[in-house]
């Protein structure tokens, strides 16, 4: 008997084993795993109610947020393909990617509706425009994410027929396009599932881990952390923007045990003034990739703070860890 390797199994496992455990901390929002699962189901059902169907591409343009995390599982369990966008790009880049990927629906953080409105008329295939905001009404010509969830069922959506296979697409992740246009890397359930297992093994991720999201979730599906940490039943502590003092405060308050980042973020942490005023009871693992950090950064992390350093390597085309 063969069992397909599906990324949706990570959330199902966490809900089954840890329904009352904290899954997400995002500002004032705290969701247990059963609550996260309900929001995921509501979004899946809302997207189906809009007429989206298996194989359709749905993009998300957002900084780190609980909305972003929800989108990974809500699209995957009904056979949609998620296209995460880099919110640092300009409108022309978004126009190219959205048309190249054949996106049918856009999920956009409230801060970024303007950049999409600039190119709305150049996106002939997009039929649905959904904005994620915690409160307030949606801007003109946008539908509210939370309003869609409120009107949708929290029950699991109908299972696709035939059942989703492990070699079906789960996301299309665009590279930076260093020498030409960005390339769309087509990730399957199997790609992302095995990468998550690689991450769990290499980083020693466990059920009592608490990850601080210093890494953008759009970056190759958060290097796979959206799947790996969820599958183990850990807690996601969301950071919308890099701020050294905020990072230390969240590590202290939430008991953060690891974070993934580029060397520039590590430097922001090390250069935070008056670091010793924070009472930190954990010994976080700082996982760095993207470029080799200076040896002095590693020494400072281990000597000044007593934290652990891990270096990893990968690229979008390998899902991404090697």
Positions of the model-derived regions?
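Conserved AMP-binding/adenylation subdomain of ANL enzymes
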Residues: 193-210, 218-258, 268, 272-273
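ATP-dependent adenylate-forming carboxylate-activation enzymes
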Residues: 62, 83-96, 110-115, 214, ...
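ANL superfamily adenylate-forming
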Residues: 114-166, 272-273
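Conserved AMP-binding/adenylate-forming core of the ANL superfamily
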Residues: 12, 20-65, 69-73, 90-95, ...
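Conserved AMP-binding A3 loop
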Residues: 32-35, 170-194
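Gly/Ser/Thr-rich phosphate-binding loop
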Residues: 147, 231, 256-261, 270-322
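Conserved pre-ATP/AMP-binding loop-to-beta segment of ANL
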Residues: 19, 142-143, 153-174, 181, ...
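A short helix-loop-beta submotif of the ANL/AMP-binding
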Residues: 56-57, 63-83, 87-91, 99-105, ...
């Amino acid at each position: 008997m063969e069992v397909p390797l599906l990324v949706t199994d990570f959330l199902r496992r966490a809900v089954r084993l840890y329904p009352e455990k904290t899954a997400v901390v995002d500002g004032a929002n705290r969701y247990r795993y059963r609550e996260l699962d309900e929001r995921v189901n509501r979004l899946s059902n809302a997207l189906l109610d809009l007429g989206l169907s298996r194989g359709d591409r749905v993009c998300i343009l957002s900084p780190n947020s609980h909305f972003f995390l929800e989108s990974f599982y809500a699209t995957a369990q009904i056979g949609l393909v998620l296209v995460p966008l880099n919110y640092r790009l300009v409108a022309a880049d978004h126009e190219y990617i959205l048309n190249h990927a054949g996106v049918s629906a856009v999920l956009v953080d409230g801060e970024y509706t303007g950049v999409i409105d600039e190119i709305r008329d150049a996106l002939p295939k997009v039929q649905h425009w959904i904005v994620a905001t915690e409160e307030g009404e949606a801007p003109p010509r946008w539908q509210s994410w939370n309003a869609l969830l409120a009107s949708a069922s929290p029950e699991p959506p109908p299972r696709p027929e035939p059942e989703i296979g492990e070699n079906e697409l789960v996301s299309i992740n665009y590279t930076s396009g260093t020498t030409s246009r960005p390339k769309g890397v087509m990730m399957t359930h199997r790609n992302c599932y095995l990468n998550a297992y690689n991450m769990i093994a290499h980083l020693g991720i466990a059920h009592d881990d608490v990850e601080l999201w210093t890494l953008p979730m759009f970056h190759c599906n958060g290097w796979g952390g959206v799947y790996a940490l969820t599958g183990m039943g850990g807690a996601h502590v969301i950071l919308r923007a890099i701020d050294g003092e905020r990072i230390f405060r969240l590590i202290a308050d939430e008991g953060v045990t690891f974070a993934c980042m580029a060397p520039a973020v590590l430097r922001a942490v090390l250069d935070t003034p008056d670091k010793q005023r924070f009472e930190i009871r954990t010994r976080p693992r700082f996982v760095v990739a993207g470029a080799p950090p200076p040896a002095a950064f590693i020494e400072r992390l281990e000597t000044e703070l007593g934290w652990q350093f891990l270096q990893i390597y990968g690229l979008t085309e390998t899902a991404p860890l090697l």
